[in-house]
Amino acid sequence: MAQATQCLKALGHPIRLGILCALKDGECNVQQLETMLGTSQSNISQHLNQMKHRDILVSRREGNQVFYQVRDVRMFELLNLLQTIYCGDDDA
C-alpha cells in the first residue's frame, strides 16, 4: 500500500505527469524534457529526483548526460487510465 501511495503522490503534479507522458516514447535527458515541457532545467531536475526517490524512474549516465526512463512500464497503463477518465475518450 505504501508503494501505491508513493506512486500516486508522484502523479500529483502537472510537471511529473508531463515527464511520464514524455517518457512514453522512450528515455530522455533533462535537456530534452526541458524542451518538451517548457520549464526550467532546475525545475525538471527537482521533479526527476523526486520520481527517482519514489522508484518510478531509473537513470543511466552517458558521458555528461543522464537519461531517464520509467522503471515499470505498467505505469503507462495507469497514465492511460487517468487520461481516459479525466481527459475524455476522443473515440467516444
Label each PLM-derived region with a short phrase.
Residues 1-3, 75-92:
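Amphipathic alpha-helical dimerization/coiled-coil segments
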Residues 47:
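Residues within the DNA-recognition helix of helix-turn-helix
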